[in-house]
Regions:
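Short secondary-structure boundary segments
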Residues: 76, 134-135, 210, 242-245, ...
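Short helix-initiation/N-cap motifs at beta->coil->alpha
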Residues: 58-60, 109-120, 242-250
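Extracytoplasmic ligand-binding site segments that recognize negatively charged/polar headgroups
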Residues: 138-141, 153-169, 203-225, 269-272
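Structured C-terminal subdomain patch of bacterial secreted/periplasmic proteins
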Residues: 49, 162-165, 172, 181, ...
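Bacterial Sec-exported substrate-binding components of ABC uptake systems
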Residues: 5-7, 11, 21-78, 177-207, ...
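A short, structured surface patch at a secondary-structure boundary
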Residues: 71-125, 129-135
Length: 331
């Protein structure tokens, strides 16, 4: 039991670290890039002559490969998901230690990643390409990797449009352009259809809990995927006035009185589920969402990880709130 609690605490801390450091360090050199990039611009990025590939990564760096990569190390969980989604998962020869989806990625050798990435482990795997986020390495580390013949490609989505760009970029690097386009098109279709029906959710208010009470409450404010999806669905994020991932108090949640609570806390099979824990919190019984039991637990990173399943998370949230609205109408 104690082990599970410690593991849960570690997971919560890692999730917050990944969210809080979703920006580039000052010492990574970046070429100038357009601040606003839409899907149409992204679709025009790949430009290949013969078997060679030329593209621009998400730090504005020019990427040139003699041919589509066949050996890849991906440090971020989102990039691993993208590779499998576009049918290129078999190209992975190494992954960041926190990459966990889909299940088959766990069969790929793991390398130490995050703030203490192990350069020697990566070089030993002899990849042609390393997929990394903007905050993953310093400029000196990038030079070390590229001196070893490894092309570093930055994939760093900060909004839904950035996810489209990341998928398109990885499709270009792997020669899976058409598969990438299909994934992006499917996501666009899903999200577009949801936005058309946003009025059906009646502007319900929602509180996103990204870290549970026992580890300190954190929520998603402006500039996060969760807030972007809430806005798309016509929902009101009760902490939209916060910026990024914000630490909050119980009193602030009680005052906000959300109609719906979305928690991404993990459950490891012992004790209360995340929903049961929220329902049992002293003093929370007067919150509308708690009073009505309108609490959604999404444990699989659909709303927090910048990958293809963002659309699935949006669909799950829409369906949950739509059911609440329908039930209220029937009452």
């Amino acid at each position: 039991m104690k082990t599970n609690k410690l593991f849960a605490a570690l997971i919560a801390a890692l999730l917050l670290l990944g969210m809080l450091f979703a920006c580039a360090p000052a010492d990574i050199a970046a070429a100038p890039a357009n601040e606003a990039t839409n899907l149409q611009e992204v679709d025009e990025i790949p430009a290949a002559e013969g078997t060679g590939i030329e593209t621009i990564d998400m730090m504005g760096r020019e990427i040139k490969l003699p041919e589509a990569a066949t050996r890849i190390v991906a440090l971020s969980a989102a990039d691993c998901e993208i590779l499998y989604a576009i049918g290129a998962g078999d190209l992975l020869v190494g992954r960041g230690e926190f990459c966990d989806y889909p299940a088959q990625v766990l069969d790929v050798p793991a390398v130490q990643s995050g703030m203490e990435t192990n350069m020697e482990q990566i070089i030993a795997l002899a990849p042609q390409v390393l997929l990394m986020s903007a905050m993953a390495q310093t400029e000196d580390q990038v030079k070390q990797l590229e001196a070893a013949g490894i092309q570093c490609v930055v994939s760093d989505a900060k909004d839904i449009n950035g996810v489209y760009q990341a998928i398109t970029l990885i499709g270009a690097v792997t020669g899976h352009d058409e598969d990438a386009f299909a994934v992006v098109s499917s996501m666009e279709t899903t999200l577009s259809e949801l936005s058309v029906h946003a009025s059906e959710l009646q502007g319900k208010s929602v509180y996103f809990e990204v870290s549970p009470l026992q580890y300190g409450l954190w929520t998603a404010g402006k500039g996060t995927f969760m807030d972007e999806i809430a806005t798309m669905l016509g929902l009101t994020n009760v902490f939209a006035d916060a910026t990024g991932w914000a630490e909050i108090s119980e009193e602030q949640v009680l005052k906000a009185n959300p109609d719906v609570i979305v928690t991404i806390a993990m459950y490891f099979g012992e004790g209360q589920t995340p929903v049961e824990e929220i329902l049992a919190r002293p003093g929370w019984q007067d919150i509308t969402a708690v009073k009505n039991g309108d609490i959604l637990n999404l444990q699989n990173n659909e709303l927090s990880r910048p990958g293809p399943r963002i659309a699935d998370g949006a669909q799950a949230l829409f369906d949950f709130v739509k059911a609440i609205v329908s039930e209220n109408k029937a009452a």
